[in-house]
Amino acid sequence: LVTTAGVTTNTNQLIRIGHGPNNATANLYLNGQLAPGIRVAMTTYSSARHHNETWVKDGYLLIDASPIDWAPLNNIMKYVTIRAGHFEINYGDAHFRRSDNGNSIRNALVGNYIMDAFTTEVGGEVYVRANGFLAMAGVTGGEVRGMITNPQKRSPSYLTKIGYDKQFSNDFRFRLTGSEYATASSVSNTLFSGDRAGSRYYDVLQNTSSTESAQAWSGAIQPGLSNSIHSVVVNPFVQFKGLEFFGNFERAKGRAAGETANRTWKQNVEEVVYRFAPDQRLFVAARYNTAAGQLTVGTPDVTVKRSQVGGGWFLTPNVLTKIEFVNQKYLDFPTTDIRNGGQFKGFMVEGVVAF
């Protein structure tokens, strides 16, 4: 119970929710070709759950050809790509398949992962690709915003990715990548809390004071490893004709400000999609997602389990409608936590237009 201005509120009383629509979300993409091999890109969230007003998500410069006609540099740039600016970092492969606010055409289901590894940071990445092999190394400021104050509390973040991706035939593709992200100290690192759009699961397991924007990440777990973090993820992808398998096997270790010991979180995701009909316009999908770890130092692990099944129909290549049934359970949460013994389930229907 919390008393404010003489009013007592039970912070563990669930807000009542029912059937109804979410607010519409929208993205605006601006892309420009400045010169051969030099591009600029900017993404704006025109409307989001967390921010209802228009604001910029990211913007960056990408170079994949030599701006100077010099043979040695031309040969190098056949294999190298450079990106610099304020961008969505390339940690893991799951961010290629998630819903990014209004852009949800790449997500076979409606919701994202329980632990959503997605953020934008200021820095640079260098890619090398050859014969199906790929490698990336990057360095960023480690936070959503570029900041120079409190330098004693801030250090760069380093990220790497290695992998292999090959289309062996028209029917078979295989991809396997491993990614690593690390920062020694930060005022507010957001690797698992950088989604500034918000969850699709409005107000689930929130109390009666919940608002659409303040509790924008309902249904998700943000482990709070905001001061230091070391995270690794392995992503296998196999496609045979219309059948796809994608996996996400992740381990993150770190702590929040004021904590003297590290906490560990683990997440596993298995997703299967089957696309069929002419031009693979119809699909069915299933995903099983678990996340487990410590909410605070010295406490037992808690676990969240989510099952999602659904499908969709591409009316055209850029118009999609999809449906999902989601069932999420919370295990071993403290008795004082509103999520103790919690569960939510139900249907979601979503329409997507990309143009």
Question: Which residues make up each language-model segment?
Answer:
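Short glycine/proline-rich turn/loop motifs
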Residues: 6-9, 217
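Outer-membrane beta-barrel pore domains
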Residues: 14-15, 60-63, 71, 172-183, ...
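Outer membrane beta-barrel
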Residues: 1-5, 13-145, 151-185, 269-276, ...
